């Protein structure tokens, strides 16, 4: 057993927010049981964390976060929960596992941490999240711009 990849569908047709329903969480519990004692990465669109960006949190993962945290904690081998949706690079945790929200490969959203903050596009450079995991070293996450820039220049 090497590293196991698990994808979860958080999309709700016709709605901006995400959910994890009981059927999907039951499936995840059974899948994690097959991976007992083995490293796992979970991938999903809506991140299972509160970012502090009020407008995005209001339409984020609105159902299933608590049970997901319980399943992740019980398994103990989840190396990463990777997500997107927020159009910003964000790092947090859930159930003892790191949550990494990749930045957007198009536009970013303005960082607005006011309690009643709104949504605004910020024309920051597009980026991607790259994940590297080895049994010896564990996880490293890199955010990389996808546009060409001068360099590299030796230091």
Residue ranges: model-predicted function:
Residues 1-2, 124:
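Short Pro/Gly-enriched coil loops immediately N-terminal to beta-strands
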Residues 2-12, 41-43, 97-103, 141-144:
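Active-site-proximal beta-strand elements of phosphoester/diester hydrolases
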Residues 5-21, 69-76, 146-154:
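Charged, low-complexity, helix/coiled-coil-prone segments
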Residues 10-11, 52-56, 111-114:
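Short acidic, glycine/proline-rich loop/turn micro-motifs
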Residues 12-14, 48-50, 108:
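Feature marks short, surface-exposed loop/turn motifs that line or immediately flank catalytic pockets
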Residues 14-22, 114-121:
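Acidic/histidine-rich helix-loop elements
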Residues 17-98, 127-130, 139:
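His/acidic metal-ligating clusters that form di-metal
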Residues 71, 92-155:
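Binuclear metal-dependent phosphoesterase catalytic core
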